[in-house]
């Protein structure tokens, strides 16, 4: 989809927009107000009511900006985050890098008995400032971080295709907020365009 727009400039707003359809607010995030997020509709809660198991994977701190509280209230049953990775694997500002996150995610998919149907969220962090990643292919630090994120997603998809789960899986790739570069002055909407990609077996 090429006509898709970010609802925010921060994860604490973008995640709520994606999962609950709640528009981002300019000065604060509803994620910080559990008494309000408890009443929001959510994709995870609807899927839970339909019998899906729900998990969330993130290499960083799931309590950052009250994210854990929101995820639990929205229906997420299991959260894998920074403290579930050895200290040696938490190399950057945002915790475990994306390739480590996807390795853990794929390992769990293969080794743990999966309750089906399932809905799993993997939140990456490498395409976020300070753009320090274990990947050195491009001179531009920001573009290099995005190339690293792409390679991690690509590696995961290639490996996941080899599993029997692939044929019944829909993968949705979507950023939670707009990118790092300044918005073009002549067409500010261009700065809010984000990809939405659907792939599967």
Region spans (language model):
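Solvent-exposed soluble domains appended to multi-pass membrane proteins
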Residues: 1-201
């Amino acid at each position: 989809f090429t006509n898709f727009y970010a609802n925010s400039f921060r994860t604490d707003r973008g995640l709520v927009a994606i999962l609950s359809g709640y528009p981002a607010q300019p000065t604060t995030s509803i994620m910080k107000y559990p008494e309000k997020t408890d009443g929001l509709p959510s994709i995870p809660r609807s899927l839970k009511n339909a019998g899906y198991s729900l998990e969330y994977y993130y290499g960083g701190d799931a309590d950052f900006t009250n994210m854990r509280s929101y995820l639990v209230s929205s229906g997420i049953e299991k959260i894998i985050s920074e403290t579930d990775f050895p200290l040696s694997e938490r190399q950057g500002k945002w915790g475990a890098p994306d390739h480590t996150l996807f390795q853990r995610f794929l390992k769990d998919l293969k080794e743990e008995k999966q309750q089906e149907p399932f809905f799993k969220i993997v939140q990456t962090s490498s395409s976020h400032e300070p753009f320090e990643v274990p990947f050195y292919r491009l001179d531009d630090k920001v573009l290099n971080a995005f190339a690293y994120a792409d390679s991690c997603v690509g590696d995961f998809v290639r490996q996941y295709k080899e599993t029997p789960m692939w044929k019944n899986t829909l993968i949705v790739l979507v950023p939670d907020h707009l990118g790092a570069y300044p918005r073009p002055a002549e067409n500010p909407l261009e700065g809010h365009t984000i990809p939405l990609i659907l792939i599967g077996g």
